[in-house]
Each structure stands twice: as structure tokens, then as C-alpha cells.
Design a protein with these regions (language model features):
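Small-residue-enriched hydrophobic alpha-helices in membranes
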Residues: 1-159
Length: 159
């Protein structure tokens, strides 16, 4: 059983922000307006506080995320990808790196559960708000850009 104490402070900071980075990947794939972005962010937050598995590692992450929310701390604090054309690539690289950290120290089952959690978080963010259209008409629940990014998130974390 892997717990928070198995990771350095820097590693743990990256691990607890990973669900939010997975949600950010979706927002970057097809940026909508402020309401769509807020819905996607809230979906990522909900997923980050409700892991789909009972693995101790995921429970520890969720508890720390809940504490951050209660203290009104930004879960993406310290994560500042550069503003460039390669922003999506940087976000996927962060997810890949965090998954490598988890895979190196956690059991295979925990690493798989963590990867699945990141994928499900990206799916929740994508499904949270319709994209495109006009005043909701003709909009897609999950845009082509978001579908592509979900596949890239899955590939990045090996999920």
C-alpha cells in the first residue's frame, strides 16, 4: 500500500494537482467561454475529490485536495506552463511525468487506478459543458478537439 509518505513534497504536490492538469488539458483542447471553463473546472474538482477506487493512494490525494479547497488554495499553484503553441504538449508531458512518478513508487494496481482516475477526470471535464453552436443550439457535448485530447491523456498516462 502506497501512501503520501512514500513521495517527496515536490512529487506529492505534482500528484495532487494531476487531476486538475487533466481537466486543464480538456479546457485547452477546445477553449469555450467563461461558463464552459467554470463547468469543466468544477467537474475536475468533483472528480479530484471523489476517486473511483478505494486505493489508499487515491484516497490520500482526495483528502489533500479537499483540504486545499477548504483552505481556498489553488490546486494548480506552482504549475505554470509557458504560454506558447505547445501548451497542450506541456500539459500532457506533466501528466506523463506524474504517472511515471506514481508508477515508480506505487503498486501496479495503484498506478493503474491513478491513471484511470486521470482519464476519468478528463472525461468528466469534457462532458461538463457543451462546445460550439449558438446559445446552446447545435453545440456538441464533447467536441472533436476534446475527444482527441482525451485520447492523448489516455496515451500519456498509459490508461
Amino acid at each position: 500500500m502506497t501512501t503520501k509518505s512514500d513521495f517527496s513534497d515536490e512529487e506529492w504536490s505534482r500528484i495532487i494537482r494531476a487531476p486538475f492538469v487533466a481537466g486543464l488539458a480538456i479546457t485547452l483542447a477546445d477553449p469555450g467561454g467563461p461558463f464552459e471553463t467554470a463547468k469543466e473546472s468544477m467537474a475536475a474538482l468533483k472528480s479530484a475529490t471523489n476517486p473511483p477506487s478505494r486505493e489508499q493512494l487515491l484516497a490520500d490525494v482526495a483528502l489533500d485536495v479537499q483540504a486545499m479547497v477548504q483552505q481556498r488554495h489553488n490546486p494548480l499553484q506552482g504549475y505554470k506552463p509557458s504560454h506558447s503553441e505547445a501548451l497542450g504538449t506541456q500539459v500532457l508531458g506533466e501528466l506523463r511525468d506524474v504517472q511515471a512518478i506514481v508508477s515508480a513508487k506505487a503498486t501496479p494496481q495503484e498506478a493503474e487506478a491513478f491513471a484511470g482516475w486521470l482519464v476519468s477526470t478528463s472525461q468528466a471535464a469534457a462532458a461538463a459543458a457543451k462546445e460550439g453552436g449558438f446559445m446552446g443550439f447545435g453545440a456538441e457535448q464533447v467536441s472533436q478537439g476534446e475527444q482527441t485530447m482525451m485520447g492523448q491523456v489516455r496515451q500519456a498516462v498509459g490508461g
